[in-house]
Amino acid sequence: QVVNRGGHLPGSDFELVSWSQGEVLHNFSSSEGAPNAPTNRPASIEKRRLLFLTGIVVDLETSLRNISNVKEQGGKFHIAMVARANAAAKKLDSVLSVIAAPGIADVTSNIPKPIGTDSAIDPNAPKGLADAITVFLGSSDGTNLKALDPMISNSTKGQPYGG
């Protein structure tokens, strides 16, 4: 309703690495000096690789969940979420072409490509993606994801605080 009738945007062009490494670095709990005197340092390349993959998976997961729960078929929100899901699925396919992530690949193999406004989305797909990325993150420290480096943006959202 907020998008379809209220004119609000259905989302932003969010990319986890650039947003989490800009003016607000999200490393305080794990940074040098934590918990008493944490530093505001950028994430390591290994951590940025994991953030990059996580951001894409969460974008697809959220978009699929939104499509599954849409109230107005063919409305602005529905169309925007289908476009967003297709963009995220395309990015994820690119990622999966250069890294091994079998659990994630298994879930994405059951997602229609491309997704249309009339596509049936497996109601278990969003949770399947969430579970798969959780398992993946528990088994990877990012060192095995070097192939993602050319895909990861070096730009940030805002300038980091220098303190």
Where do the protein language model's features map onto the residues?
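Primarily the internal scaffold of c-type cytochrome electron-transfer domains
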Residues: 1-162
